[in-house]
Amino acid sequence: MVFLCLHRCISSTKICQILIFSIYSRRIYLIQIDTKNMNEDLDDVVILSAVRTPIGSLRGSLSVLKAHQLGAVAIRGAVTKLNGSISVDDINEVIMGQVLSANEGQNPARQAARSGGLPYSVPATTINMVSGSGLKAVILGAQAIRTGDANVIVVGGQECMSQAPHCLSLRHGKNLGDISLVD
């Protein structure tokens, strides 16, 4: 589960700071770019903060948590790593990818945003594009920033496969006998 705060690096500030978390080395890097010698039309989308939760196993210690609860932990962590350089009030939107949202309630991205400490004023969207859901959220966030619709967006993916429900086909009831659960 990777969460990113995306932000437009505007050349008028002359200095753009980027906070990057390396998943592999588990270290945080603050990169500062001097933009005064760069193209004045600089409108690159940069990653301000990135966080992931541990990868759990089926029915492991994280299995009791719903996906939006894991998402909330990561959102809070990504915002905390910004060390106040961007306020939660500066966040324009949350876009989260999630494949299995059954039994999660309505709009799991919104639940993660609220539980992650973001204000009610920040809208949230849940994307389902199967395995590409988290990456699609990143793409949509970057597009919104590049088109000028937003300046700061929290994007990522959340999932807890241990919470995936089993389904019974009971729309028309069931007579006596065995019934199969669908996984």
Language-model features: where?
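Short glycine-rich phosphate-binding loop at a beta-alpha junction
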Residues: 90-97
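Acyl-thioester C-C bond-transforming condensing/cleaving domain
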Residues: 39-45, 57-88, 103-183
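Short polar catalytic/cofactor-binding loops
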Residues: 51-55
